Amino acid sequence: MTQISGSPDVPDLGRRQFMNLLTFGTITGVAAGALYPAVKYLIPPSSGGSGGGVTAKDALGNDVKVTEFLASHNAGDRVLAQGLKGDPTYIVVQGDDTIANYGINAVCTHLGCVVPWNASENKFMCPCHGSQYNAEGKVVRGPAPLSLALAHATVTDDDKLVLSTWTETDFRTDEDPWWA
């Protein structure tokens, strides 16, 4: 039986070569699927996108509206909200009933516990290992090695609070921010 070959430009792919190619493709696909989560874990998350920040969310997941927020909180309060990367961030109410231009990340720099505000002692006190931070989040007692991270807090024209990455000098330590 005579077989008529197609174009001489088309390479002949034998059964063995086809099976090798199919096996290689299958193994590569499975390996890539297995490695994807590991590689994604090693790449740090973005800090809220390039849009200039994220809108702070209250405990119920609603956008923080500044006038309503100030009506229900007193001067000196530090109130948890969802901030950059979804981290808990304290919104600071100043003495003149305005919101401070900074937010304080509530994640302890020792082992990552959420640090509650202790109003009676006017400081943040970590329940895990006893680290303490002053009212601005500067570490005053270890074992935490660093102060709490800061975020810019800005009120938008539509009365929402936007938190963005703090990249300037840390006003508490006069050093470059360790978190940027």
Swiss-Prot record:
Catalyzed chemical reaction(s) = 2 oxidized [plastocyanin] + a plastoquinol + 2 H(+)(in) = 2 reduced [plastocyanin] + a plastoquinone + 4 H(+)(out)
In terms of InterPro entries, this protein maps to: cNMP-bd_dom, Cyt_b6_f_Rieske, Rieske_2Fe-2S, Rieske_2Fe-2S_sf, Rieske_Fe-S_prot, Rieske_Fe-S_prot_C
Q: Which residues bind [2Fe-2S] cluster?
A: C108, H110, C126, H129
Localisation per UniProt entry = Cellular thylakoid membrane
Q: Enumerate the Gene Ontology biological process terms.
A: photosynthesis
Report the record's disulfide bonds: C113-C128
Topology relative to the membrane = Single-pass membrane protein
What cofactor does this chain's UniProt record say it requires? Answer: [2Fe-2S] cluster
Q: Where are the transmembrane segments?
A: 21-43
- Keywords assigned: 2Fe-2S, Disulfide bond, Electron transport, Iron, Iron-sulfur, Membrane, Metal-binding, Thylakoid, Translocase, Transmembrane, Transmembrane helix, Transport
| Enzyme class at the top of the EC tree | translocase
Q: What is its EC number?
A: 7.1.1.6
An example Gene Ontology molecular-function term: plastoquinol--plastocyanin reductase activity
Quote the cellular component terms of the Gene Ontology held in the record: plasma membrane; plasma membrane-derived thylakoid membrane
**Family annotation (Gene3D superfamilies):** Rieske [2Fe-2S] iron-sulphur domain (2.102.10.10), Single helix bin (1.20.5.700)
Q: Where is the Rieske domain?
A: 66-162
* Cofactor: how bound: Binds 1 [2Fe-2S] cluster per subunit.
* HAMAP family named in the record: Cytb6_f_Rieske (MF_01335)
Q: Say what the protein does.
A: Component of the cytochrome b6-f complex, which mediates electron transfer between photosystem II (PSII) and photosystem I (PSI), cyclic electron flow around PSI, and state transitions.
Report the family membership: Belongs to the Rieske iron-sulfur protein family.
What does the subunit section of this Swiss-Prot or TrEMBL entry state? The 4 large subunits of the cytochrome b6-f complex are cytochrome b6, subunit IV (17 kDa polypeptide, PetD), cytochrome f and the Rieske protein, while the 4 small subunits are PetG, PetL, PetM and PetN. The complex functions as a dimer.
- State the remark under miscellaneous: The Rieske iron-sulfur protein is a high potential 2Fe-2S protein.
What is the name of the protein in this document? Cytochrome b6-f complex iron-sulfur subunit 2
Q: Which gene encodes it?
A: petC2
